[in-house]
Amino acid sequence: MLQRSLGVNGRKLAMSARSAKRERKNASTAASKCYVVPPSARGWVHAYSVTATSMLNRRKAILDYLQGAVWVLPTFGVAIGLGSGAVLSMIPVKSGTLIDKLMFQGTPGDARGVLIVVSATMITTIGIVFSLTVLSLQIASSQFSVRLLRTFLRDVPNQVVLAIFACTFAYSTGGLHTVGEHRDGGAFIPKVAVTGSLALAFVSIAALIYFLHHLMHSIQIDTIMDKVRLRTLGLVDQLYPESDTADRQVETPPSPPADAVPLLAPHSGYLQTVDVDDIAELAAASRYTALLVTFVGDYVTAGGLLGWCWRRGTAPGAPGSDFPQRCLRHVHIGFERTLQQDIRFGLRQMVDIALRALSPALNDPYTAIQVVHHLSAVESVLASRALPDDVRRDRAGELLFWLPYPSFATYLHVGCAQIRRYGSREPLVLTALLQLLSAVAQNCVDPSRRVAVQTQIALVVRAAQREFADESDRAMVLGAAARATEVVERPGTLAPPPSTFGQVAAAQAAASTIRSADRDG
């Protein structure tokens, strides 16, 4: 009887588990995430879930800070070097063995001299490496963009090389205090420690050579643009994983009720990240709704409006006095923009490189054209993705939290507007923008996005007609605009090859203009 009862109960539990698994799977395929908290367990479930998610978000924030902190890995290197140097100095080596023959052979004075030379050399090398690093930061800020400094600070190879040098210095210093100690009336030579110091010296030489190689490549404009492009595309995949479809339904945020309470910024700064899951779970457990009206990446002033919150249910009302404060704990405002949830910042970094290249001080339009090529890769992916706001609802369909994201037209404007204005005197820059717009239009399935592309094409045409006095320059841009417009107006049309927008098109337009002038003459 007991076994039969256990078997029946086991089958019931298994069926219940399979049913719960199916429910979780169905819920995960819904358009927005759902949060259901039983009333009897609301308190402890909410406390556990929000605490766990907050810890994960806090870990991400700490990890993001540590990746950009230059002192972290060198500090670990110093600690490891001091510890290993002191420990290896206490390891004796039996005289006459094979290991003894491989170890350092010399007097205590020789051992002390080796350790001192290695330590002094590492201090000098660390100073050189720091100087070269600061020089690369200066070049990046003056030649490319000040907003790229964060990318250089997050460069792991530089931090690893500094850690190796710091470890070698600390290791050699840690073994110095044991040289010359007398054991049984004889001088003690830390052969293992001295041999390790020599080995670390050769490792440091290899690290220095690699550092110089890496530094020379890292300050190249192509490497910088590729890093920014890849990081931005990674964020696009994270925020917008689904492809766009022609029958996609666009949700619009609700209007806050009259008794909604404003969510005000606690201090001035850039809206860096929002813990969407935390706020949704908080709203699910408290039966509130929160709506943000500020995009991630926007600058807010202290006391400025971030959003609204109100009570859900049949009898709406203002939330309790502590709900806005609890909600604002999961809205992070900082002194700088980051790429954690802000795609526009990745576009801004690339646009800044183009603007600096188009400035009279540099006058490097080809670099601006390269930036446009990298921007086309990001904008084309954005054109092919569904760009919904981040919405959280419960199983009943009631809104828990709404985080707005910029529209496709906004992303396209960020990538094209300033380059069009500052590059309006260079026809190849404008034709590169038209090449970008034709590639974007090829991936658009939403008619409203095609309208946004057509608007940008019209703005490029107006800039060309206003700025270019030479007929061949104007003809080249207008011809490229006509080809891009054809892609916009005929869905399914492939974008023309790059040769129709670049130097080949420029040469053809110039030759055609000269022939027309000769015939007219």
Curated annotation (Swiss-Prot):
Spans through the membrane: 68-88, 114-134, 160-180, 192-212, 290-310, 399-419
Compartment annotation: Cell membrane
Region annotation (Disordered) ranges: 1-25
Membrane-related topology note: Multi-pass membrane protein
Gene Ontology cellular component list: cytosol; plasma membrane
Superkingdom assignment: Bacteria
Keyword Transmembrane helix attributed: yes
InterPro entries for the chain: DUF2254_membrane
Keywords, in A-Z order: Cell membrane, Membrane, Transmembrane, Transmembrane helix
Pfam family of the protein (one): DUF2254
Keyword Transit peptide: no
Name assigned to this protein: Uncharacterized protein Rv1290c
Species the sequence originates in: Mycobacterium tuberculosis (strain ATCC 25618 / H37Rv)
